[in-house]
């Protein structure tokens, strides 16, 4: 994981520096404030993402996004999800916590909210039907 931080911090600029081909690394980022960019910023911690070289457009790209974009929406066979520390981001590895980078989503409500539909919605989300729809949307089921 530190190697990914190093790439985005600009410490590695060629794939040959990390065991790959002699090609410029093109670290792709997302729009500031987007959900996936916010997760990447948190992953980077105190380290800043380096400015791109003008030559990076000709290089081999590395990027990040939520798994549901890759698994459920994009469907581009040329784009590959990579294992981190030998652990592939499968639904099972995300669900059991062995994949090192995850972002959780929450359904929350105020304790003083008396709307009678809230427990019904929560029960449905946790039901087999709700979990199946979550999975079909590219997310990982809770249970």
Residue ranges and their predicted role:
Residues 1-143:
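Exported/periplasmic ABC-transporter solute-binding proteins
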């Amino acid at each position: 994981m530190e190697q990914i931080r190093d790439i985005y911090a600009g410490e590695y600029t060629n794939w040959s520096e990390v065991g790959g081909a002699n090609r410029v690394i093109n670290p792709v980022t997302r729009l500031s404030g987007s959900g996936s960019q916010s997760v990447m910023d948190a992953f980077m911690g105190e380290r800043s993402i380096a400015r791109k070289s003008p030559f990076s457009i000709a290089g081999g790209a590395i990027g990040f996004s939520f798994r549901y974009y890759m698994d459920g929406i994009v469907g581009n066979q040329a784009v590959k999800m990579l294992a981190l520390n030998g652990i592939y981001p499968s639904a099972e590895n995300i669900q059991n916590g062995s994949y090192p980078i995850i972002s959780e989503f929450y359904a929350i409500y105020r304790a003083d909210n008396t709307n009678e539909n809230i427990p019904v919605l929560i029960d449905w989300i946790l039901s087999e039907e709700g979990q199946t729809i979550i999975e079909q949307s590219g997310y990982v089921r809770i249970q």
